[in-house]
Amino acid sequence: MTILNKDTLAIIMIGTTHVIDMGGKSAFIHYETGTRAHMLLPDGTRFHGLWTLQDDGYKVEWQDGPTGAWKLDHTPGAIDYVDATGTVRGRISRIDFGDPERLAA
């Protein structure tokens, strides 16, 4: 288990879209810039908000939605999203460059 640090997160997050497997359903998070993010949940709910990198994770504040603190945990062959309680909430199934899901639109 390796929690990814700020420098690594900046490389794999800014300007990309993470496709996250949430138990057989996919969520999409597009990190448009170093401060703006957009999310589409499996049930169709969309959020737009502000995020900031931390030394060992990031924080996000969704407009009209939740605020959260997250870490990305790397193990060989996988990167998991871990919430503030230490619970794994999803696994990255792929990372796309840009915004192919048009979440920022």
Show which residues each predicted segment covers:
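Lipid interaction determinants
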Residues: M1-L50, Q54-A105
